[in-house]
């Protein structure tokens, strides 16, 4: 279970992981590049797993209320770079993942001295 003080973070995590799933769906909808397709399929599986984990931990009443918006925005974030090619796709993924890493590091820092949340901290390290 997620402590109350982390619920706002995990609501954001829920939105972000949903967006990530749809980024890869957007890429896969358009890209014909076999390396990009392989890369995107692998990452889609990983992001879908992260999303399932967050949905399991975060009570449904705290899930993002704008979930459909995050799906559309994620899809667009993957689809548009696909119009411009492999380098744009990788640059987009790098930018998104850099932001996510900073977001999760903020949560890890908050939890780092709280031994009772060690499992949650480990989860954030692997997301």
Across the structure, where does each feature detected by a protein language model lie?
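Residue-level recognition of alpha-helical structural elements
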Residues: 6, 36, 62-66, 86-89, ...
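Conserved alpha-helical segments that form or flank metal/cofactor-binding pockets of metalloenzymes
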Residues: 37-71
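Short hydrophobic helices that act as membrane-entry/anchoring signals
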Residues: 67, 71-78, 82
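Terminal targeting/low-complexity segments that flank the catalytic cores of oxidoreductases
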Residues: 1-12, 32-35, 58-61, 114
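Inter-helical turn/loop segments and adjacent helix faces that build the functional surface
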Residues: 30-38, 106-121
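Alpha-helical bundle segments that constitute or directly flank the non-heme di-iron/ferroxidase center
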Residues: 4-31, 79, 83, 87-110
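Conserved small/polar residues in nucleotide/adenosyl-binding loops
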Residues: 125-126
């Amino acid at each position: 279970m997620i402590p109350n003080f982390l619920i706002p973070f995990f609501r954001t995590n829920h939105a972000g992981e949903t967006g990530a799933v749809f980024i890869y769906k957007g890429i896969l909808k358009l890209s014909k590049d076999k390396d990009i397709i392989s890369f995107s399929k692998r990452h889609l599986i990983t992001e879908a797993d992260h999303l399932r984990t967050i949905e399991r931990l975060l009570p449904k009443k705290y899930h993002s209320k704008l979930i459909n918006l995050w799906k559309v925005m994620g899809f667009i974030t993957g689809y548009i770079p696909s119009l411009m090619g492999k380098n744009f796709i990788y640059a987009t993924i790098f930018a998104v993942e850099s932001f996510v890493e900073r977001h999760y590091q903020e949560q890890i820092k908050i939890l780092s001295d709280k031994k009772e949340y060690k499992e949650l901290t480990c989860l954030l390290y692997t997301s």
